[in-house]
Amino acid sequence: MVAVASQISCSHCGAPLPVQPGEILITCSYCGFTSVVETGKAFEFEHSLILNTLPPAQVFDSIKGWMKNSFVAPKDLSKKSSLIEQNLVYLPFWVVSGEATSHYKGIFERISPPEEKEGDITNHYDWMVLARTQTDFPTRSYHLSLEGKIPFEATKIEKGAKVLNSEMSAEDAVEHARDEISNLHQYLAKDKVDKIVDIKTNFEVSETSYLHAPVWFLTYAYKDKRYQVLLDGAIGQVIKGDLPGEDFKLI
């Protein structure tokens, strides 16, 4: 059975709000009020916005600069590529802040004889979790600064931009962050020991907040093929992009 979008009314201003299947939070595009889809009640967490700084006319110029600086892109890519489509999307993120501490025990095998070793890894994190379930967005490659965030205002969203809603609860986001941080600390521990015998990680959450951040989704063409690029709308840097390879020629 195909899931069908529904519609509810904003509990703050009464505007009609289309709800896509799977969305559990919805932000009104008229007044900026965020509510829980199931109950219609007000959202209890801080909701922030990172502003887009790139006018539409400058987006492809930023991509061309990235092309010119690439060591693997064809030399004529910036001149011969053409823009097919670009869309500004405000992606929803949960920001899970807190301190994580791991205690590890392992075997250090880089000396002879090998010796047992243990230690601690402690770091503070503002861990970003994309609040969408069916996506392969490279969140760990997205180095977003939270310094420029402001309280969410619908009037700050550009006309034509799309604001995606959350498909993930705060509780699920915390568990997701906890799992990813545990995996990160296990990776860091492997730099200290060659074989991990035991590792335990404790993540103390101090704050959970909700955030929308601007990302340009762009498609360009080169030699009859299409390629995708994701561009950070806040600072104009490429998050991830596809590049065509150089044609191989015999000398």
Per-region residue spans from a language model:
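Residues immediately within or flanking Cys/His clusters that coordinate Zn2+
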Residues: 5-7, 25
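Short cysteine-rich clusters marking metal-coordination/redox-active sites
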Residues: 10-13, 28-31
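Cys/His-rich microdomains that often coordinate metals
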Residues: 17, 35
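Short Cys/His-rich "knuckle" micro-motifs
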Residues: 20-23, 38-42
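Charged, low-complexity helical/coil segments in non-catalytic cytosolic or luminal regions
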Residues: 44-229, 241-251
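A charge-rich, low-complexity, intrinsically flexible signal that marks solvent-exposed coils, linkers
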Residues: 231-233
